[in-house]
Amino acid sequence: MNILDRIIETKRTEVLQLKLTGVERIDREALKPSIKQRLAGADLSVIAEIKRASPSKGAIALDVDVVAQAKQYETSGATVISVLTDETYFKGSMDDLAAVAAAVDIPVLCKDFMIDRIQIDRAKVHGARLILLIVAALEQEMLADLYAYAYAEGLEVLVEVHDEEELRRAEAIGAQIIGIN
Protein backbone atom coordinates (compact mmCIF):
# COMPACT_ATOMS: atom_id res chain seq x y z
CA MET A 1 0.00 0.00 0.00
CA ASN A 2 1.52 3.34 -1.06
CA ILE A 3 1.20 6.60 0.88
CA LEU A 4 -1.74 7.85 -1.18
CA ASP A 5 -3.63 4.61 -0.47
CA ARG A 6 -2.90 4.94 3.27
CA ILE A 7 -4.03 8.57 3.30
CA ILE A 8 -7.28 7.73 1.47
CA GLU A 9 -7.97 4.88 3.90
CA THR A 10 -7.52 7.33 6.79
CA LYS A 11 -9.85 9.81 5.05
CA ARG A 12 -12.56 7.14 4.79
CA THR A 13 -12.43 6.75 8.58
CA GLU A 14 -12.50 10.53 9.06
CA VAL A 15 -15.48 10.88 6.72
CA LEU A 16 -17.43 8.26 8.69
CA GLN A 17 -16.74 10.23 11.87
CA LEU A 18 -17.75 13.51 10.19
CA LYS A 19 -21.01 11.96 9.09
CA LEU A 20 -21.71 10.89 12.66
CA THR A 21 -20.91 14.26 14.21
CA GLY A 22 -22.00 16.51 11.35
CA VAL A 23 -20.43 19.68 10.05
CA GLU A 24 -20.69 22.74 12.23
CA ARG A 25 -22.12 25.81 10.57
CA ILE A 26 -20.10 29.00 10.75
CA ASP A 27 -21.47 32.30 9.50
CA ARG A 28 -19.06 33.65 6.90
CA GLU A 29 -19.00 36.96 5.12
CA ALA A 30 -19.03 36.99 1.32
CA LEU A 31 -16.61 34.64 -0.34
CA LYS A 32 -13.15 35.90 -1.25
CA PRO A 33 -12.55 36.90 -4.88
CA SER A 34 -12.66 34.23 -7.55
CA ILE A 35 -9.36 32.52 -8.25
CA LYS A 36 -10.18 32.54 -11.97
CA GLN A 37 -10.61 36.32 -11.82
CA ARG A 38 -7.29 36.66 -10.01
CA LEU A 39 -5.52 34.46 -12.57
CA ALA A 40 -6.98 36.26 -15.60
CA GLY A 41 -4.41 38.54 -17.15
CA ALA A 42 -1.82 37.89 -14.46
CA ASP A 43 1.78 37.58 -15.63
CA LEU A 44 2.66 35.42 -12.64
CA SER A 45 0.42 33.69 -10.15
CA VAL A 46 1.68 32.13 -6.95
CA ILE A 47 -0.12 29.66 -4.74
CA ALA A 48 1.70 29.98 -1.42
CA GLU A 49 1.39 27.01 0.91
CA ILE A 50 1.11 26.59 4.65
CA LYS A 51 2.35 23.09 5.46
CA ARG A 52 3.34 21.93 8.93
CA ALA A 53 4.62 18.48 7.92
CA SER A 54 4.50 15.86 5.19
CA PRO A 55 4.87 12.08 5.00
CA SER A 56 8.03 12.40 2.89
CA LYS A 57 9.75 15.29 4.72
CA GLY A 58 8.46 14.81 8.27
CA ALA A 59 8.19 17.94 10.40
CA ILE A 60 8.55 21.14 8.35
CA ALA A 61 7.08 23.94 10.47
CA LEU A 62 5.00 22.38 13.24
CA ASP A 63 4.81 25.60 15.26
CA VAL A 64 4.20 28.00 12.37
CA ASP A 65 2.00 31.00 13.12
CA VAL A 66 -0.41 30.42 10.24
CA VAL A 67 -1.92 33.90 10.40
CA ALA A 68 1.45 35.66 10.33
CA GLN A 69 2.61 33.40 7.49
CA ALA A 70 -0.58 33.99 5.51
CA LYS A 71 -0.35 37.76 5.93
CA GLN A 72 3.27 37.67 4.78
CA TYR A 73 2.26 35.65 1.71
CA GLU A 74 -0.55 38.11 0.93
CA THR A 75 1.73 41.13 1.34
CA SER A 76 4.29 39.46 -0.93
CA GLY A 77 1.74 39.14 -3.72
CA ALA A 78 0.48 35.57 -3.48
CA THR A 79 -2.59 34.90 -5.61
CA VAL A 80 -3.93 32.14 -3.36
CA ILE A 81 -2.97 30.68 0.00
CA SER A 82 -3.09 26.90 0.24
CA VAL A 83 -3.64 25.48 3.72
CA LEU A 84 -2.95 21.80 4.38
CA THR A 85 -5.77 20.61 6.62
CA ASP A 86 -4.98 16.89 6.90
CA GLU A 87 -4.24 16.19 10.56
CA THR A 88 -2.80 12.68 10.44
CA TYR A 89 -0.12 13.02 7.77
CA PHE A 90 0.41 16.78 7.39
CA LYS A 91 -0.38 18.01 10.94
CA GLY A 92 -2.74 20.68 9.62
CA SER A 93 -6.26 21.46 10.78
CA MET A 94 -9.53 23.11 9.93
CA ASP A 95 -8.65 25.66 12.63
CA ASP A 96 -5.62 26.63 10.51
CA LEU A 97 -7.90 27.06 7.50
CA ALA A 98 -10.42 29.18 9.41
CA ALA A 99 -7.72 31.38 10.93
CA VAL A 100 -6.08 32.04 7.56
CA ALA A 101 -9.40 32.66 5.80
CA ALA A 102 -10.38 35.22 8.45
CA ALA A 103 -7.01 36.98 8.25
CA VAL A 104 -6.53 37.57 4.51
CA ASP A 105 -8.47 39.06 1.61
CA ILE A 106 -7.24 36.65 -1.07
CA PRO A 107 -8.73 33.23 -1.86
CA VAL A 108 -7.82 30.35 0.44
CA LEU A 109 -7.49 26.77 -0.81
CA CYS A 110 -8.39 23.86 1.44
CA LYS A 111 -5.69 21.36 0.52
CA ASP A 112 -6.80 17.95 1.66
CA PHE A 113 -7.66 14.57 0.23
CA MET A 114 -11.32 15.06 -0.66
CA ILE A 115 -13.29 11.83 -1.08
CA ASP A 116 -16.78 12.86 0.08
CA ARG A 117 -19.15 15.84 -0.17
CA ILE A 118 -19.14 16.35 3.59
CA GLN A 119 -15.48 17.35 3.41
CA ILE A 120 -16.41 20.05 0.90
CA ASP A 121 -19.11 21.32 3.26
CA ARG A 122 -16.59 21.41 6.07
CA ALA A 123 -14.02 23.29 3.96
CA LYS A 124 -16.62 25.87 2.96
CA VAL A 125 -17.79 26.62 6.49
CA HIS A 126 -14.17 27.07 7.53
CA GLY A 127 -13.63 29.75 4.90
CA ALA A 128 -12.21 27.95 1.86
CA ARG A 129 -12.84 29.65 -1.48
CA LEU A 130 -11.57 26.66 -3.39
CA ILE A 131 -10.78 23.02 -2.79
CA LEU A 132 -8.33 20.51 -4.21
CA LEU A 133 -9.41 17.36 -6.01
CA ILE A 134 -6.63 14.87 -6.74
CA VAL A 135 -7.44 12.84 -9.86
CA ALA A 136 -5.22 9.93 -8.74
CA ALA A 137 -7.24 9.57 -5.52
CA LEU A 138 -10.70 9.35 -7.11
CA GLU A 139 -12.66 7.19 -9.49
CA GLN A 140 -13.97 9.20 -12.44
CA GLU A 141 -17.60 9.19 -11.27
CA MET A 142 -16.66 10.49 -7.81
CA LEU A 143 -14.29 13.06 -9.31
CA ALA A 144 -17.12 14.41 -11.47
CA ASP A 145 -19.58 14.36 -8.56
CA LEU A 146 -17.32 16.21 -6.13
CA TYR A 147 -16.35 18.73 -8.81
CA ALA A 148 -19.97 19.53 -9.65
CA TYR A 149 -20.97 19.63 -5.98
CA ALA A 150 -18.21 22.08 -5.06
CA TYR A 151 -19.24 24.47 -7.85
CA ALA A 152 -22.90 24.12 -6.87
CA GLU A 153 -21.85 25.18 -3.36
CA GLY A 154 -20.14 28.29 -4.72
CA LEU A 155 -16.58 27.00 -4.46
CA GLU A 156 -13.94 26.71 -7.13
CA VAL A 157 -11.85 23.61 -7.69
CA LEU A 158 -8.17 23.10 -8.38
CA VAL A 159 -7.86 19.68 -10.04
CA GLU A 160 -4.45 18.10 -9.52
CA VAL A 161 -2.99 15.83 -12.20
CA HIS A 162 0.28 13.94 -12.46
CA ASP A 163 0.33 12.72 -16.06
CA GLU A 164 -1.44 12.96 -19.43
CA GLU A 165 -4.05 10.32 -18.62
CA GLU A 166 -5.07 12.23 -15.49
CA LEU A 167 -5.13 15.44 -17.53
CA ARG A 168 -7.62 13.82 -19.92
CA ARG A 169 -9.75 12.77 -16.94
CA ALA A 170 -9.69 16.34 -15.60
CA GLU A 171 -10.64 17.73 -19.00
CA ALA A 172 -13.49 15.19 -19.24
CA ILE A 173 -15.19 16.75 -16.20
CA GLY A 174 -14.70 20.26 -17.56
CA ALA A 175 -12.03 21.26 -15.06
CA GLN A 176 -11.33 24.98 -15.38
CA ILE A 177 -8.29 25.16 -13.08
CA ILE A 178 -5.75 22.35 -13.41
CA GLY A 179 -2.53 22.01 -11.45
CA ILE A 180 0.30 19.70 -12.43
CA ASN A 181 2.18 18.04 -9.60
Where on the chain are the PLM-derived regions?
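Catalytic-face loop-and-helix region of soluble metabolic enzyme cores
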Residues: 177-181
